[in-house]
């Protein structure tokens, strides 16, 4: 057969190739190793046919492809028969060098004569047989390697992403690189800072599609939407509580199906009597309010101290009327007899509508909420516990938010600004109250007359005129009033904390600091003309 020669010579480096001799060679020349670059010239030839010249070592071939003697289906196996020239061989004999390239390890299937297949990249075994490649990759290919898990060494945090672990480690190091430009707030995450800035701007991008509710946090919106989710369930026959949708319960276990063990429903997590339960003998939840009702106890537990004086009267949850002694004590419903008869007469045994639809209610006052943490925070107003104290003054509060709001009094910070006027304040509620001055809105209306105002405090003060109650009494004289501001101004007459001293006259002492002088003189003369000398000691109606 004609042989094709290579047209362009190429340098080939053969390192670590051991050159073996023919049978006629001795063992010394057989250890020859070629480590230099040989420039192959016109002697490089490619042999394409089967080996025809067996035993003929005097050919001029340098590299060829020898077919397996058995002729199996694995194809050609590369060989390295080198032919040297007469000058290089010395004796005119050809050297045959066979490659000692390390063959891949045979699997257990190949050892038994089976055809080799793809191996697992993790365990090295056949694909699909090991425990690490049982599922297989997408499309039936090789299995995908398992996803890495980045775990925290200080806590149980685990994530598939290293960036999440780096962000989490800032909670342990205390690093807070994201700081608010308007207040001392700082956070370890940018998303928290973005949520915080909405407290300064008043932005509420998350709105409920079912009601006018809007908030600045997506979590608060999802929590609110639970009140609209699903049809309302039937009310509880004992307390009237109703939830938005029933919770899915797990299937009963075999012991529960046989009746050997009572089944515990998931709804058992809901408080059955709309009150905060305190375990018997344990008051660590509210250390200063051990008289709260526990399991199986009445309103006052045995051996406990009497209840402190309430901050406001016990009122009915249905109509708001003040309850008499003995009313509302049945199951802590806080309902008057008329509302209870109305509920029973209507054929329903549920509680009143309105605040009672909320799941967690205070047993000492009409407060009710959907969230147990709000109830726990509210109970501090009854126990008198104030763990949050100001470092600059004796101020203390039961809520951390109130302390933060109070600290702005010392710093002079006023982050909330009115867009219509130069007004600024340190409380968002004050800004909303101020906005009613521009809008003219007066949402607080008296149910006994046509009076309306834009502040709830003014309505409470106005209601004292209908009831005639004057709770503020002077300890020095017989002066009584229903307004705390008037009481403080009256104390200046006696020289208690007033800058004007004891010589301050009564009409001037009653004057509000924000009222114009003409109104003050008219109000003072009218009070003196109506009540005479008694106007010095009694507030005008």
Swiss-Prot record:
<keyword id="KW-0862">Zinc</keyword>
<keyword id="KW-0539">Nucleus</keyword>
<feature type="compositionally biased region" description="Basic and acidic residues">
    <location>
        <begin position="103"/>
        <end position="115"/>
    </location>
</feature>
<keyword id="KW-0479">Metal-binding</keyword>
<protein>
    <recommendedName>
        <fullName>Zinc finger protein 513</fullName>
    </recommendedName>
</protein>
<feature type="zinc finger region" description="C2H2-type 6">
    <location>
        <begin position="416"/>
        <end position="438"/>
    </location>
</feature>
<keyword id="KW-0238">DNA-binding</keyword>
<feature type="zinc finger region" description="C2H2-type 2">
    <location>
        <begin position="178"/>
        <end position="200"/>
    </location>
</feature>
<dbReference type="GO" id="GO:0008270">
    <property type="term" value="F:zinc ion binding"/>
</dbReference>
<dbReference type="GO" id="GO:0005634">
    <property type="term" value="C:nucleus"/>
</dbReference>
<feature type="modified residue" description="Phosphoserine">
    <location>
        <position position="85"/>
    </location>
</feature>
<dbReference type="GO" id="GO:0045944">
    <property type="term" value="P:positive regulation of transcription by RNA polymerase II"/>
</dbReference>
<dbReference type="InterPro" id="IPR036236">
    <property type="entry name" value="Znf_C2H2_sf"/>
</dbReference>
<feature type="modified residue" description="Phosphoserine">
    <location>
        <position position="96"/>
    </location>
</feature>
<dbReference type="GO" id="GO:0060041">
    <property type="term" value="P:retina development in camera-type eye"/>
</dbReference>
<comment type="subunit">
    <text>Binds DNA. Can associate with the proximal promoter regions of PAX6 and SP4, and their known targets including ARR3, RHO, OPN1MW2 and OPN1SW.</text>
</comment>
<keyword id="KW-0677">Repeat</keyword>
<feature type="zinc finger region" description="C2H2-type 7">
    <location>
        <begin position="444"/>
        <end position="466"/>
    </location>
</feature>
<comment type="function">
    <text>Transcriptional regulator that plays a role in retinal development and maintenance.</text>
</comment>
<dbReference type="GO" id="GO:0003677">
    <property type="term" value="F:DNA binding"/>
</dbReference>
<dbReference type="Pfam" id="PF00096">
    <property type="entry name" value="zf-C2H2"/>
</dbReference>
<feature type="compositionally biased region" description="Acidic residues">
    <location>
        <begin position="44"/>
        <end position="55"/>
    </location>
</feature>
<dbReference type="GO" id="GO:0000976">
    <property type="term" value="F:transcription cis-regulatory region binding"/>
</dbReference>
<comment type="similarity">
    <text>Belongs to the krueppel C2H2-type zinc-finger protein family.</text>
</comment>
<feature type="zinc finger region" description="C2H2-type 5">
    <location>
        <begin position="388"/>
        <end position="410"/>
    </location>
</feature>
<feature type="region of interest" description="Disordered">
    <location>
        <begin position="492"/>
        <end position="541"/>
    </location>
</feature>
<feature type="zinc finger region" description="C2H2-type 1">
    <location>
        <begin position="150"/>
        <end position="172"/>
    </location>
</feature>
<keyword id="KW-0863">Zinc-finger</keyword>
<dbReference type="InterPro" id="IPR013087">
    <property type="entry name" value="Znf_C2H2_type"/>
</dbReference>
<feature type="zinc finger region" description="C2H2-type 3">
    <location>
        <begin position="206"/>
        <end position="228"/>
    </location>
</feature>
<feature type="region of interest" description="Disordered">
    <location>
        <begin position="1"/>
        <end position="120"/>
    </location>
</feature>
<keyword id="KW-0597">Phosphoprotein</keyword>
<feature type="zinc finger region" description="C2H2-type 8">
    <location>
        <begin position="472"/>
        <end position="494"/>
    </location>
</feature>
<feature type="zinc finger region" description="C2H2-type 4">
    <location>
        <begin position="360"/>
        <end position="382"/>
    </location>
</feature>
<keyword id="KW-0805">Transcription regulation</keyword>
<keyword id="KW-0804">Transcription</keyword>
């Amino acid at each position: 057969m004609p042989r094709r020669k290579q047209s362009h010579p190429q340098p080939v480096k053969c390192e670590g190739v051991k050159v073996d001799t023919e049978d006629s060679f001795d063992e010394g020349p057989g250890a020859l190793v070629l480590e230099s670059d040989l420039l192959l010239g016109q002697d490089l030839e490619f042999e394409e046919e089967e080996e025809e010249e067996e035993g003929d070592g005097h050919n001029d071939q340098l590299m060829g492809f020898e077919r397996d003697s058995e002729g199996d289906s694995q194809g050609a196996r590369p060989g390295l028969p080198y032919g040297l020239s007469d000058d290089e061989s010395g004796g005119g004999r050809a050297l045959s060098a066979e490659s000692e390239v390390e063959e891949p390890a045979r699997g257990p299937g190949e050892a038994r004569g089976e055809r080799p297949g793809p191996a697992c990249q993790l365990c090295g075994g056949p694909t699909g047989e090991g425990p690490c490649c049982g599922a297989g990759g997408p499309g039936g290919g090789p299995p995908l390697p398992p996803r890495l898990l980045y775990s925290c060494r200080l806590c149980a945090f685990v994530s598939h992403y290293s960036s999440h672990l780096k962000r989490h480690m800032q909670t342990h190091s205390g690093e807070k690189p994201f700081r608010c430009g308007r207040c001392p707030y700082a956070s370890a995450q940018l998303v928290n800072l973005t949520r915080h800035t909405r407290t300064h701007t008043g932005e509420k991008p998350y709105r409920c599609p079912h009601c006018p509710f809007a908030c600045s946090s997506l979590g608060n919106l999802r929590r609110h939407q639970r009140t609209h989710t699903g049809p309302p369930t039937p009310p509880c026959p004992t307390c009237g509580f109703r939830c938005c949708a029933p919770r899915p319960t797990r299937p009963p276990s075999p012991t529960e199906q046989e009746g050997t063990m009572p089944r515990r429903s998931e709804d058992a997590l809901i408080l059955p009597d709309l009150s905060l339960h305190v375990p018997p003998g344990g008051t660590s939840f509210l250390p200063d309010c051990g008289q709260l009702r526990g399991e199986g106890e009445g309103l006052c537990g045995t051996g406990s101290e009497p209840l402190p004086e309430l901050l406001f009267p016990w009122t009915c949850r249905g109509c708001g009327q003040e309850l008499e002694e003995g009313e509302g004590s049945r199951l802590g419903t806080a309902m008057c007899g008329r509302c209870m008869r109305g509920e029973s007469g209507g054929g329903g045994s549920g509680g009143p509508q309105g605040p009672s639809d909320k799941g967690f209610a205070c047993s000492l006052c009409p407060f009710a909420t959907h969230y147990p943490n709000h109830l726990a925070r509210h109970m501090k107003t009854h126990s008198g516990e104030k763990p949050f104290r100001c470092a600059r003054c004796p101020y203390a509060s039961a809520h951390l938010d109130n302390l933060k709001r109070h600290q702005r009094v010392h710093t002079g910070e006023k982050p909330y600004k009115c867009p219509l006027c130069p007004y600024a304040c340190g409380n968002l509620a004050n800004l909303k109250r101020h906005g009613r001055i521009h809008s003219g809105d007066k949402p607080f209306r008296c149910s006994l007359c046509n009076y309306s105002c834009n502040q709830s405090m003014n309505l409470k003060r106005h209601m004292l005129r209908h009831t005639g109650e004057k709770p503020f009494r002077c300890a020095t004289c017989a002066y009584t009033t229903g307004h705390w501001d008037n009481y403080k101004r009256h104390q200046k007459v006696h020289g208690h904390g007033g800058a004007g001293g004891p010589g301050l006259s009564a009409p001037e002492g009653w004057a509000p600091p924000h009222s114009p002088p003409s109104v003050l003189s008219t109000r003072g003369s009218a009070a003196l003309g109506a009540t005479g000398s008694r106007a010095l000691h009694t507030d005008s109606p």
